Amino acid sequence: MTRPTWDQYFTKIVKVTSERSSCERLHVGCVLVKDNRIISQGYNGFLPGCKHNSIVRDNHEQATVHAEQNALMDCAKRGVSCNNSTAYITHYPCIICTRLLLAAGIKEIKYLTDYKNDELVANFCEQCNTIICKLL
């Protein structure tokens, strides 16, 4: 058996992380990695402590927190810096999550699945010298 590459390893982990999602429409996971060590994980789900009441507007769930946001908030709560780290995400990030990842100092975004790929995401990454790439 061959040893998986780091990308293969974290790809498996982010897929399993997404399985924790309580969202019926889409299961998204995010794993933040620094120096090949996981510093945080998150998945999309309802607000902590709140009932799982779905509120959909314009085909988008309003009552959930995105996976990337949950991973970043976990770092903030625990006082862990994610500066110069890599985000492994199951789906192409939205504009808001991209802005948050970039503001937090994420230097590489690796995603598995195309999802409403907005050109602003790539534009913001380029402006911030952050690599965004799809893993096969």
Could you describe each region identified by the protein language model?
Residues M1-L136:
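Zinc-dependent deaminase catalytic domain
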